[in-house]
Structure formats: C-alpha cells, structure tokens
C-alpha cells in the first residue's frame, strides 16, 4: 500500500528534465553535465517557406520566426501577429496577382507554436534540453550539439479545447565551427525588434544567393546557399503540430574555442573546474588521519574494552598535549623577554 504524500513527492521528480519559462537562460542551457551558451543567437530569426496552389492560383509563403532567449516583440502595430509571450510563431501569407493588377498580400493563417500562452488560450511554456552526444539514440550520438524542445502553443488559440491542437518546436543546434549561426538568413515580411548588431547586417542579407525551387506544390524553404537555420518540416504527428528546425552554429560545439564558441562541462569556468595539487593533498591527508583514528579506536574497543579518551591511539600523549603546549609557550616567552638587566643573576 502506497502513501499519497510519497506519490506527491515523486511526481515532480519524474518531470525533472522539463523546465518552466522562469528557468530558461539561453546563456546557460544545461544538458547532461554540459552547459551551452546560446546567448549570441538571441533575437528574432526567421525561415521562410513557400508552396504554390494552382486553384486559386497563388503562392503561400509562411514565415517561421523564433527567439530562443525571450518572447518575440513586434516592432509595428499590425494585428496579424502572434500574441504576447510567443517564442515561436508561424504566419502564412497568400500572394496572388490578377494580370496587370498589383500583387495582393493576404494573411491566411497565424499559429503560435511555442511560448508562455496560458492567458491567450494556449498552455504554459516548457522546454526540454537534450545533449546529442550522450543521447540514447545511436543516430544522435554521432552528432555534437543540443536539441531543444519548446512547447506552449495551440492551434487555434480560441474555441473549444477539443478543437485545439497542441504545438511544439524541436530545434537541433548542430556544431559547425565555421558558422556563427546568422549566415544566409532570409529577409521575411514579418518585422520584429532586433538587437543593434543584427540591424547592421540587414543590407548584406538582401542581395544574392537566393535559392528558389520554382512552382512547387510542396512546401519548401526559401534560402540562401550558406543558410545556417534550416527548416525541416511542420506536420501534425500524433495529434501534435511539430515544427522541426536545424541550426548550424559554433555555439553548439562542446569544446570552447578562441572566438567564443562552445560551452563548458559541469556549468563552471575552466579556471575553477579542476582542483589543485595542494587541495588534493590536504583532502587525502585528512582522510588517512581520520581512517587511522577510527580504525585504532575500533581496535582498542574490541580488544581492550577501552572507553572515552582511552579509545584513541596514543591517548596518554593526546591528554598531555595541552600541558606540553603550555610549557612550550612559557619557554618561548621567557626566551623572547629575557631575564632582565641583571646579567643573568637573580636578586637575593
């Protein structure tokens, strides 16, 4: 028969690998004894996919935007956006043109995939990190990096609960020592507030290197040749909408390099992660002395039935230590102070 209070204690432990929004620090993502620093990848980053539908004719472009460090914040006042607290958002545009008329842009779908969306019709934001090199899957063990699962979204956010589909994003950060992680990013229609250093590179990303696969009815990514952020798919699996992304970056490398990539084992700095020789010497000496005292006390108790101070080895010497120290200190004081100015003779 089990105790209810014991069950209440064990249930939180079973969910230990899942973390809440308050504990997400992109600069210190700990997974299986290793700490990854993804703070340099903070800010909004987007991938854009396209799909052509012949009837009615038009291109459906979907912009998937994420921020691994904090919720997305729109720079404008457009209503076509995910609610506050969203970290991963998908917005679909229908692009169509009628002959010589101007091309029309219509927002057809908005999906909040992950974020703290309890107040918007979704659920609580949770994230699960997995260190690929020590994962259970054989295919993952061949990789170096981090898998991050982000949850909290539902589609649609409004309406009866039974009509809502849970959403989540699975992002694999793979080690690439030659990539910062911001290369080849496609400029999307959605405008989010960026970090100052990202705004300086916007003009460089708008020219050259485009890769479009033409009038395809299958959803595919619009990307440059050197793209670091790759879209792998967005499909419903077991009643859950799952967005899969792969992010090639040096910040997923486990070995720290001179340019700041990688993380650290045990969540500590290299200078404090190893003990020095003196520390080990003191520790071993303490253990040896403690072991000697315990073993000798046990011998004295079992063989001679000793009690109290008699249990300790050399108990007579130990008892005399205070008196020996007192006599030793007295001799030192007499030597330092001397016998006065009588030339070594005492008064009669």
From Swiss-Prot:
Residues 24-255 form the MRH domain. This is Autophagy-related protein 27. Pfam families: ATG27. The keyword Transmembrane applies. Glycans are attached at residues 61, 84, 226, 270. The gene is ATG27. Residues 180-208 have a biased composition (Basic and acidic residues). Residues 180-219 are annotated as: Disordered. It is a single-pass type I membrane protein; Single-pass membrane protein.
């Amino acid at each position: 028969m089990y105790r209810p209070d014991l069950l209440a204690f064990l249930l939180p432990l079973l969910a230990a690998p899942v973390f809440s929004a308050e504990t997400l620090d992109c600069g210190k993502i700990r997974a299986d004894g290793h700490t990854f620093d993804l703070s340099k990848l903070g800010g909004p980053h987007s991938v854009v996919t396209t799909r052509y539908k012949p009837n009615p004719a038009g291109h459906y472009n979907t912009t998937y935007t994420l921020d691994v460090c904090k919720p997305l914040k729109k720079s404008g006042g457009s209503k076509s956006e995910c609610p506050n607290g969203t970290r991963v958002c998908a917005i679909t545009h229908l692009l169509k043109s009628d002959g010589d008329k101007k091309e029309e842009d219509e927002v057809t779908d908005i999906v909040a995939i992950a974020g703290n969306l309890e107040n918007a019709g979704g659920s609580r934001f949770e994230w699960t990190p997995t260190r690929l090199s020590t994962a259970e899957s054989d295919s993952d063990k061949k990789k170096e990096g981090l898998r991050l699962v982000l949850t909290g979204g539902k589609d649609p956010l409004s309406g009866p609960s039974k009509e809502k589909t849970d959403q989540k994003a699975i992002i694999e950060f793979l080690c690439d020592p030659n990539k910062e992680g911001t290369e080849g990013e496609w400029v999307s229609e959605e405008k989010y507030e960026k970090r100052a250093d990202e705004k300086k590179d916007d003009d460089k990303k708008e020219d050259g290197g485009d890769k479009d696969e033409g009038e395809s009815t299958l959803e595919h990514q619009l990307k440059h040749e050197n793209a670091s952020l790759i879209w792998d798919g967005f499909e419903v699996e077991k009643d859950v909408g799952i967005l899969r992304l792969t992010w090639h970056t040096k910040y997923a490398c486990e070995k720290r390099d001179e340019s700041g990539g990688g993380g650290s084992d045990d969540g500590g700095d290299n200078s404090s992660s190893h003990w020095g020789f003196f520390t080990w010497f003191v520790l071993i000496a303490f253990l040896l002395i403690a072991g000697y005292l315990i073993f000798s006390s046990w011998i004295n108790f079992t063989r001679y039935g000793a009690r109290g101070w008699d249990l300790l080895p050399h108990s007579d010497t130990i008892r005399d230590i205070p008196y020996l120290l007192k006599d030793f200190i007295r001799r030192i004081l007499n030597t330092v102070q001397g016998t006065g100015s009588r030339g070594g003779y005492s008064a009669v």
